[in-house]
Swiss-Prot record:
It comes from the Bacteria. The keyword GTP-binding does not apply. NCBIfam families: reco (TIGR00613). Keywords: DNA damage, DNA recombination, DNA repair. Transmembrane segments: none annotated. One of its GO terms (cellular component) is bacterial nucleoid. Pfam families: RecO_C (PF02565), RecO_N (PF11967). This is DNA repair protein RecO. GO terms for biological process: DNA recombination; double-strand break repair. Involved in DNA repair and RecF pathway recombination. Belongs to the RecO family.
Amino acid sequence: MFQKVEGIVIRTTDYGETNKIVTIYSREFGKVSAMARGAKKPKSRLAAISQLMTHGHFLIQMGSGLGTLQQGEIISSMKEIREDIFLTAYASFIIELTDKATEDKKHNPYLFEMLYQTLHYMCEGVDPEVLSLIYQTKMLPVLGMRPYFDTCAICHQETDFVAFSVREGGFLCSRHAEQDPYRIPVGEAVHKLLRLFFHFDLHRLGNVSVKDSTKKQMRTVLNTYYDEYCGIYLKTRRFLEQLDKFQI
């Protein structure tokens, strides 16, 4: 059965000398994989459409197992991302997280829209690190995780937040922070932004400016929480950490 889907290429795997297995996150079916025969040949009609991060329409012969990519039409090649090493690094982190966090053929139009919108914001010049933090925060419920972002994880009151506790699963107020010796001290902006990122509609994102120190604290909170509860290892995260050392 042939299906036309709108999707974004989130992974490619070489198969033999000339073929690729292309993994697409689609609006209609979620994550699907298909064999792109001859796609590694420079003159192949599938060469461009099967590139990582390409947003397009794909005609796939679907089956119970691996499908076959017949043809495609590019909507956006994400050129702006491809031409910038830092954008490529953050976009690669986002698509790898999407790949590792999802199962095959699990329909989730919300997640497709979030992936699409995030990558297009990157192309438009929005801070890629902030976008990756937003995406990482919004992926938490997709993975079945809901940290205490609105109230203290211990007293459940909306009060002054001074730390994040991985053990308790959320922010801690000044009265209860001492209960976790391994708490992560955070500024007020970290709580406000993570809470905002968790709840707000990504389509309503305007001009956003976040201090480097705040971004660093947010990254520490999210990465530590993911490490404890998620169990997903991302190669791109390590590359981002290495790349950050060279960024002025």
